[in-house]
Every structure is written in C-alpha cells, then in structure tokens.
C-alpha cells in the first residue's frame, strides 16, 4: 500500500497523474511538466512536498550533537535562520543532504529526504550516546507546501502579513499565519527561484493549498508535480539524493563542498576523509554535459573518453528553459575541463557531448 499525503484527494480535482515515488503515491504532473516548469520560471507554482521528513532535535546538547553529525557549521545559526548541510559516513559518503532550522537555543528542526527518513532517524539515534537530546520524528504530523517562482511573494502577501513576505533567503518564522493557520514558513526552495516553504499541521494542508491557489490563480499560479520539481532543481544544479549524492558519492564530489566545513572545531563524522579529499582534490567531479549528437543523457548512462569509461550520468533531460539536451555527470576529475568532448552511451550508441559550465539556469537577482 502506497503512502499518501494529506493533500492526496485535492490532486484529483486537478487531474493529477500520480506515480510511486519511494513508496509514496505522488503527482508527477498536473497539466504537463513543461507547462509547470515554465510557470515556476516565469510566474509561480505550488508543490505538495509533504512526503519530506521532519525531525525535531531538542535538549541541552542539541548543538554539540548536530555539530558532530552534520558537515556544515551549525554554530553559525541564530534563531530564525536555516542552513543547508550534509550528513556523512566515516568514509565521507553521504547519509543525506538536509536543511537545519534553529527555532531557538537547543531547539532545531531537520528537514530530510523522504526516501531516507527511517535510515536518517536510525543514524541519529545510533549516535545519540550520552548526549542530552530528544530526537523526535514528526514527519507524519507535518505537511509541507512549496510556493515557488518570481511571483511567490506577490501571492503570499494576499494570505500572510508583511513579516512573512519580507523574510530574507534562508530565514524563517516558526510561528506565522498563512491563510489564518499557524505555520512555520521559510524563504527556501528547491527550484532555483524565489519562494517559500510552508510547514503546517497535516489537517490544515488542504485549507492552505486551496487558499493559495484561489488568490494565486489570477496571477498565473498552478499546481505542480514532481516532474517539474526535478527539471527545475536540475537546471539550478541542486542535487537529488540517490543521484548526485549517495553513500558512495561524497558532498565534495556531488558539488556541495560549500556545505562541508572541515575547518570547524567539532570533529564531525567523515571529517578526516573529507579533509583528505579536499586537500588532494576529489578523484571525481560533478560536471554539466551538453549533447552534440542527437539524444538525451539519462541517469546511469555511461560516459566515455575514447574506449575508457570515465563516469556516469546522474541526471539528464531536455532542459525546458535552455531547449537543449543536457545532463549532470560524475566523471574523473582529470577529464572535467570545460569544453572537453566525451561520449555518452545512449542505449547501443555512443553519442558526442561536451562538458559545459553549471548551473544551467541562474535567476537574475
């Protein structure tokens, strides 16, 4: 039996096409991936991402505990600020990538990937030791909506006060009102656009979803599915766990070295391995590839230089914004220079591609 979010029945109203996504029955699209993608790039889109996991970390030792588990420097956070980070194994492989929210001193919220909820919670509990921390998986109580796009703030102002719309990127309010319901709202997202993520009680999700679509529709807001979420995050070079980051791919290889602070005092799990990787330079690198020959690079397609396989495509598609066939590939660092011509094995053919700069899309500030 597939799991469903509190918004499942609202999908049907909009004719959503659902798929099995890591054990969840979720909408891959409502109208079309292309239309939803373009709405987020030019106007706004509303996503149900309630399948994501939320874990509360509270107690006297919350900070030292998180400093030991996470690669970024949590001590830099202040109340109302959020931080993107990774959690690693001793060998530098990635357990997960996540957001950490500091509500107040000794009170944090971790937002983790849906497919990793059980594994992550187990990992946290396994390392609790003597620390005075309470680790609570609250994923089932919380629904999560993402309002994304250049008109997100304009739409939000119709259902929330100025305190919400004036939030800076990576800041949040832990007790705000959106559509008369109490929520935690942050200026964050996974699309490469401006936007908000709204954490609400599961029973309030349908009300907030409907209220946002009601005020947003005249401005071009449409509901969006996982298909567009994937093409949007891909163009902005935001990694997806299981593709750009895995237990075998470190944050440095997966292109999120900025979230790894090997110079922080805390001796976090994976620090030695990642320090060594940083000093020697990772042996593999995440690069952009653009097809020269006709074909689309897809996840797990091998990448060759001559007869030698030098890596693999992690994500690829026809970019709706660029109208080009592009991909992200994890390849040997020695072959990663811009402009290098490589070959991608597309079914039985080897097709030419070149290494290009990423992100494929960056919004104008």
Swiss-Prot record:
Gene Ontology BP, a term: glycine decarboxylation via glycine cleavage system
Subunit structure: The glycine cleavage system is composed of four proteins: P, T, L and H.
Catalytic activity: N(6)-[(R)-S(8)-aminomethyldihydrolipoyl]-L-lysyl-[protein] + (6S)-5,6,7,8-tetrahydrofolate = N(6)-[(R)-dihydrolipoyl]-L-lysyl-[protein] + (6R)-5,10-methylene-5,6,7,8-tetrahydrofolate + NH4(+)
Biological role stated in the UniProt entry: The glycine cleavage system catalyzes the degradation of glycine.
Protein name: Aminomethyltransferase
Record keywords: Aminotransferase, Transferase
Keyword check for Transferase: yes
InterPro entries assigned: GCS_T, GCS_T_bac, GCST_C, GCV_T_N, GcvT/YgfZ/DmdA, GcvT/YgfZ_C, TrmE/GcvT_dom1
Source domain of life: Bacteria
PANTHER family: AMINOMETHYLTRANSFERASE (PTHR43757), AMINOMETHYLTRANSFERASE, MITOCHONDRIAL (PTHR43757:SF2)
């Amino acid at each position: 039996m597939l799991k469903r979010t509190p918004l499942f029945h609202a999908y049907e109203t909009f004719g959503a096409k659902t798929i099995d996504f890591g054990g969840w029955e979720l909408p891959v699209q409502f109208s079309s991936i292309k239309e939803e993608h373009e709405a987020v790039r030019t106007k706004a889109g509303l996503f149900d991402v309630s399948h994501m996991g939320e874990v509360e970390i509270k107690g006297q030792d919350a900070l030292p505990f998180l400093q030991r588990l996470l690669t970024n420097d949590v001590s830099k956070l202040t109340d109302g600020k959020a931080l993107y980070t990774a959690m690693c194994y001793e060998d530098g492989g990635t357990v997960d990538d996540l957001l950490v929210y500091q509500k107040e001193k000794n009170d944090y919220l971790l937002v983790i990937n849906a497919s990793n909820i059980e594994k992550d919670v187990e990992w946290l509990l396994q390392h609790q030791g003597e620390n005075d921390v309470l680790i609570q998986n609250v994923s089932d109580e919380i629904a999560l909506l993402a309002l994304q796009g250049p008109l997100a703030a304009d739409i939000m102002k119709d259902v929330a006060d100025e305190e919400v719309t004036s939030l800076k990127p990576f800041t949040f309010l832990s007790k705000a009102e959106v559509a008369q319901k109490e929520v935690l709202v942050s200026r964050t997202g996974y699309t490469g656009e401006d936007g908000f993520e709204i954490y609400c009680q599961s029973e309030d999700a349908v009300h907030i979803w409907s209220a946002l679509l009601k005020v947003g529709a005249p401005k071009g807001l449409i509901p969006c599915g996982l298909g567009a979420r994937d093409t949007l995050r891909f163009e902005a070079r935001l990694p997806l766990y299981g593709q750009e980051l895995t237990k075998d791919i470190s944050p440095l290889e997966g292109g999120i070295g900025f979230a790894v602070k090997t110079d922080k005092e805390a001796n976090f799990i994976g620090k030695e391995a990642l320090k060594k990787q940083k000093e020697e330079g990772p042996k593999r690198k995440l690069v952009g590839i653009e097809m020269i020959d006709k074909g689309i690079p897809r996840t797990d397609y091998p990448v060759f230089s001559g007869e030698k396989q030098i890596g693999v495509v992690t994500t690829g598609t026809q970019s709706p914004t660029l109208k080009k066939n592009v991909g992200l590939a994890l390849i040997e660092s020695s072959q990663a220079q811009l402009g290098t011509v490589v070959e991608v094995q597309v079914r039985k053919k080897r097709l030419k591609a070149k290494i290009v700069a990423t992100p494929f899309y960056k919004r104008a500030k």
